[in-house]
C-alpha cells in the first residue's frame, strides 16, 4: 500500500509540474531527459552529464536539489515547480552524488570534471620532444586519473575486491608505458625519417599507447563478467538470467568506446598544431605555442568525450535468438537489454 501511495503521489506531483511548464518534457524521476534510442538523444544526455558548470554548484544548492527531488517522490511539491526545475535538480544530484552510496564524488573524478582536469594531462601527453622520463610520467598520470574516475563512478551495489581495480590499474599503466616507450625508441632509431618527420610521428605515439591501455584496463577489470555472465532484463525490467554472450557484447562495446575516445583527442591536436606552427603569428610569437596547444586539446577533448560515450546506449538491446538457449526459453520477449557498463 505504501508503494502504491508513493507512486500516486509522484504521479500527482508530475501532473502539477507538467501544468507549471510546457517547455521541458514531463519529468521522470531517475530517467534520462532525452530519448536514449537515438544517437542525438544520447549525445544531449551526456552533454548534461559532463557539464562542467555543475562543478561550481554550492552545498546549499545541492541540498535544495536533493530536497526538491524528495518532495517530488513523496508528492509534496510546492505549487509552481516546473519540469525544468526538476530536470535541473536531477542533473545536479546525478553530477555530484554517487547513485548507489549517495556520497559526494571527489571533484576531479566526477564525469563533469573529466575534461577540465583531464585536459592538462592531454596537453602533457602531446608535448613535443618528450624524454623517457616525461613519457613515463604523463602515461602514468593519465592512467592514474582514468583509474580514479572509473573507481569513483563504479557500480557500488555489489562489493568488489580492491585487488580487481589494482590489477586493472597496473595492467593499464604497464601497457601504456611500455608501448609509448617502445614506439619512441623505434622512431628514434628509424634512419629513414628526417628530423621534422620524426618529430611529427612522435606526436602520434600517445594514441596507440593510450588506446591499448584502455582495452587492457577493460579486460582486466571485467574479465570476471566473461566467466560468470551479466544480467539481462526483459522490457518490463524483470531479470531473465545471466548471459556470457551478452557480457562479450558489453565488453566489446565498452572497449570500442575507449578506443574511439582518445582518437580525436590524441590525433587531431598534432595535425592541427603542425599546421598552426607554420603560421606567421606563432613563428613570430613562440610563447603562444603552449596556450594555443592547450586550447586545441581542450576543444578536441570537449568534442570527443560526448561523441564517444554516445556511440552505444547505456542499456543495450540484443535479440534472445543471439543468446544462450536457456535465456531464449526463459522469456517470451524477442529482445532483452543489458547494462554495458562504464
UniProtKB/Swiss-Prot annotation:
One of its GO terms (molecular function) is citrate transmembrane transporter activity. InterPro entries: Mtc. GO terms for cellular component: mitochondrial inner membrane; mitochondrion. It catalyses: citrate(in) = citrate(out). GO terms for biological process: amino acid transport; citrate transport; mitochondrial transmembrane transport; positive regulation of cold-induced thermogenesis. Pfam families: SFXNs. The chain crosses the membrane at residues 105-125, 165-185, 256-276, 289-309. Keywords: Amino-acid transport, Membrane, Mitochondrion, Mitochondrion inner membrane, Transmembrane, Transmembrane helix, Transport. Specifically expressed in the brain. Its main location: mitochondrion. It is a multi-pass membrane protein. Residues 1-24 have a biased composition (Low complexity). The keyword Transmembrane helix applies. It is found in: Mitochondrion inner membrane. Residues 1-29 are annotated as: Disordered. Mitochondrial amino-acid transporter. Transports citrate. Does not act as a serine transporter: not able to mediate transport of serine into mitochondria. In brown adipose tissue, plays a role in the regulation of UCP1-dependent thermogenesis probably by supporting mitochondrial glycerol-3-phosphate utilization. Belongs to the sideroflexin family. This is Sideroflexin-5. The gene is Sfxn5.
